[in-house]
Amino acid sequence: MKKKTSLSEEDQALFRQLMTGTRQIKQDTIVHRPQRKKITEVPVKRLIQEQADASHYFSDEFQPLLNTDGPVKYVRADVSHFELKKMRRGDYSPELFLDLHGLTQQQAKQELGALIAACRREHVFCACVMHGHGKHILKQQTPLWLAQHPHVMAFHQAPKEYGGDAALLVLIEVEEWLPPELP
């Protein structure tokens, strides 16, 4: 099979003329794979500690006063009620999703704590928590737990595209991100 080139016969002849007397370079370089850094136990311990710290706020005995009329919603006292309206309209799109289907209450608390810690660590402002319909245990408990956490600014029943009444959109207070200082 003949190779097709876009060069004319004249250009090909000129190229061959310029390449006379050259020889092919022998490739004798060995490329070493970069050594992987050993994963230390400190980050794993830190993640577990963040998760435990975040789930520490969730109590089954404390019942925050939430509005039971209409969709599930909550806004912290120092946050504008306009944020709820923006959540209801779908102005926020969640970057992280948490599915609590099939989890026990204890597992759900741990996962909620891990989600909030991950949002703060990754500077994610909005997340979606899918509690499902099921036996309504997690559906009732999830808003009560979220309202107790100091880093939860607000939550509202999710729009249809994110799960409707089987999910919540949650606004998380993230630390102000500062770029690293240059030396």
UniProtKB/Swiss-Prot annotation:
GO annotation terms (biological process): rescue of stalled ribosome
GO MF annotation, one: RNA endonuclease activity
Alphabetical list of SMART domains matching this protein: SMR (SM00463)
PROSITE patterns on file: SMR
Domain called Smr: residue spans: 98-173
SUPFAM superfamilies xrefs: SMR domain-like
Record-listed E.C. numbers: 3.1.-.-
Pfam families: Smr
Chain segments annotated as transmembrane: none
Keywords, alphabetical: Endonuclease, Hydrolase, Nuclease, RNA-binding, rRNA-binding
PANTHER family xrefs: DNA ENDONUCLEASE SMRA-RELATED, UPF0115 PROTEIN YFCN
Entry similarity comment: Belongs to the SmrB family.
Function: Acts as a ribosome collision sensor. Detects stalled/collided disomes (pairs of ribosomes where the leading ribosome is stalled and a second ribosome has collided with it) and endonucleolytically cleaves mRNA at the 5' boundary of the stalled ribosome. Stalled/collided disomes form a new interface (primarily via the 30S subunits) that binds SmrB. Cleaved mRNA becomes available for tmRNA ligation, leading to ribosomal subunit dissociation and rescue of stalled ribosomes.
Assembly behavior: Associates with collided ribosomes, but not with correctly translating polysomes.
Protein name: Ribosome rescue factor SmrB
Gene it is expressed from: smrB
